Regions:
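Conserved, carboxylate-rich catalytic/transport cores that coordinate ions
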Residues: 1-192
Length: 192
């Protein structure tokens, strides 16, 4: 289970049974670091879970707990989706127009201006004053925000300024992940 894998990783014990898990943890950390260096950013928001009674009425709500094993699965799924998109683009005949890509466009001009206002309010210097805001700028801004409550608030504020991701027959890239090509070869990540 995710919980057992998370505990194994937290204990940092090496054995015949855990060596692969620890190796995968290091590999996915490296993938994430490279993804962020190339322009991906991470907006951490809480995922909420609900308990329901027999009539379907919510009785309790709580934040879904995640651990390192969830992050491993997330990075593996991102990589599988990226590689599947690259494979489709490189190996399928262009006349075969049933390739479906997951696209996430850059923010609209008005929302980019709103993000700039947030950056200016917190005296954040952009890498490029006149160019479009990059996903690297957003990542650096959130990384520089040390107050965790403020970071969550700013993450949600910026997330609301993003265009929604969509599916298309042509790839325009995935702004938030920093990928040129992306698809949903796996199930959407939020389900795990």
């Amino acid at each position: 289970s995710y919980e057992e894998a998370g505990l194994t990783l937290d204990k940092n014990e090496e054995s015949d049974h855990t060596t692969s898990l620890h190796l995968l943890d290091r590999i996915t950390d490296d993938w994430k670091r490279k993804r962020i260096q190339k322009g991906g950013f991470e907006i951490n928001t809480s995922e909420w879970k609900f308990d329901f009674d027999d009539e379907g009425i919510p009785t309790k709500y709580f934040r879904k707990k995640t651990n390192r094993s969830h992050k491993i699965i997330e990075e593996c799924m991102l990589m599988a989706n990226k590689i599947a998109a690259i494979y489709m683009k490189d190996n399928l005949d262009e006349s075969f127009n049933h390739m479906i890509f997951r696209n996430h466009d850059i923010p609209s001009l008005i929302n980019e201006q709103r993000i700039r206002k947030i950056f200016n309010r917190f005296k954040f210097n952009l890498d490029s004053k006149h160019g479009a805001i990059s996903s690297k700028d957003i990542h650096r801004f959130l990384l520089d925000t040390k107050d965790q409550s403020l970071k969550k608030f700013l993450s949600i504020s910026i997330l609301k300024k993003m265009k929604k991701a969509n599916y298309g027959l042509n790839s325009i890239g995935h702004f938030g992940l920093g990928f040129n090509l992306y698809t949903h070869f796996t199930s959407p990540i939020r389900r795990y």
